[in-house]
């Protein structure tokens, strides 16, 4: 997702059908080049979300994991809106683990 796409999404602007078709074609080509099945991509998405959720609270409904192709290079892009960090919770877990280990 480019900066322009993000701004358009925030402002509620609709994409032109040609732009939408181009984006879909790029997605199909990216899937084809990487040889990733949709099931594998969904599994990767779930695992990425669960790992990130250990450290920050994310907005799963607004988040997206996708393949993007630019200049003949395909990238896995995770766009995950962060609601808040869980650093306080992590510190508590670390202290709990340390005190259990010292017993």
UniProtKB/Swiss-Prot annotation:
<comment type="similarity">
    <text>Belongs to the MinE family.</text>
</comment>
<dbReference type="GO" id="GO:0032955">
    <property type="term" value="P:regulation of division septum assembly"/>
</dbReference>
<keyword id="KW-0132">Cell division</keyword>
<protein>
    <recommendedName>
        <fullName>Cell division topological specificity factor</fullName>
    </recommendedName>
</protein>
<dbReference type="InterPro" id="IPR005527">
    <property type="entry name" value="MinE"/>
</dbReference>
<dbReference type="Pfam" id="PF03776">
    <property type="entry name" value="MinE"/>
</dbReference>
<dbReference type="GO" id="GO:0051301">
    <property type="term" value="P:cell division"/>
</dbReference>
<keyword id="KW-0131">Cell cycle</keyword>
<dbReference type="InterPro" id="IPR036707">
    <property type="entry name" value="MinE_sf"/>
</dbReference>
<comment type="function">
    <text>Prevents the cell division inhibition by proteins MinC and MinD at internal division sites while permitting inhibition at polar sites. This ensures cell division at the proper site by restricting the formation of a division septum at the midpoint of the long axis of the cell.</text>
</comment>
